[in-house]
Amino acid sequence: NCPAGCRSQGCCM
């Protein structure tokens, strides 16, 4: 899982 906000920045795929 990715921290909140990371997913929207595309740093976690």
Curated annotation (Swiss-Prot):
GO molecular function terms noted in the UniProt entry: calcium channel regulator activity; toxin activity
GO cellular component, one term: host cell presynaptic membrane
Tissues showing expression: Expressed by the venom duct.
Domain of life: Eukaryota
Subcellular location, principal: secreted
Modification after translation (UniProt): Contains 2 disulfide bonds.
Subcellular location: Secreted
Presence of keyword Disulfide bond: yes
Keyword Secreted listed: yes
UniProt keyword terms in alphabetical order: Calcium channel impairing toxin, Disulfide bond, Ion channel impairing toxin, Neurotoxin, Presynaptic neurotoxin, Secreted, Toxin, Voltage-gated calcium channel impairing toxin
Domain notes: The cysteine framework is XVI (C-C-CC).
Function according to Swiss-Prot or TrEMBL: Omega-conotoxins act at presynaptic membranes, they bind and block voltage-gated calcium channels (Cav). Reversibly blocks calcium current in the dorsal-root ganglion neurons of the rat (high voltage-activated channels but not low voltage-activated channels). Does not modify the voltage dependency of activation and inactivation.
The protein's name: Omega-conotoxin Cl16a
Organism: Californiconus californicus (California cone)
